[in-house]
Amino acid sequence: MSKIIALANQKGGVGKTTSSINLAASLAVLEYRTLLVDADPQANSTSGIGFDPRTIKSSIYECIINDIDPKDAIKKTETPFLDLLPAHIDLVGAEIEMINLHEREYRMKTVLNKIKDEYDFIIIDCSPSLGLITINSLTAADSVIIPVQCEYFALEGLGKLLNTIKIVQNRLNPELAIEGVLLTMYDVRLRLANQVVEEVKTHFQELVFDTIIQRNTRLSEAPSFGVSVIMHDANSKGAINYLNLAREIIRKNGLAQEEVEQAVTL
């Protein structure tokens, strides 16, 4: 049975897409069948994993709006065990087109229900907004990861996101849980970053992942090569961070296999 995890934060620049790509790739490297769903009209997960959105013929847009079979849109990536359900620019207009569709909040759920048994994990890179596409993603998901950057105003806007999650829980998806709060862009040398870590841990307590994603050059440059950081440099801090996150999620969900190693310390 697949675990569907959405990564959501309407605030840009928090590492949402980076985390979606690299968490999905890390789960795949650990040999869990993983699908990365690009539900962001910017299609950065699509390009960041090696596909040109301009050449995509069938995407999540066609699945949601035109009811095409998602199997006809899914792409195999260069990473074993990792598939992609891509996005392209047409997704920008999807929210307007969905207004008059039947059960518009459940379109993504209907799509993923057709394929979820073929994967261990489905990772959804949500749109950086709280619009209908994000509502669809949260309605389809079992849980949500909230990326928070270790910078000034880190908690700004989280109230709106948490309220949206609560609305989805009350009206559309009562089983939706918060998988965890993920601290990103951490620089141990900066006092502010350490203050943010403490502030977030005080606010969210046990919901904060033990794994913290550090600032890392290899992590930043990997998307320009169209690969995950673990495919770009498996020994980099970024690759190790995301492998540790994947292991933490696997253990939390009781899915650990004997071959999954303990977390690597830096």
Positions of the model-derived regions?
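P-loop NTP-binding core
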Residues: 1-266
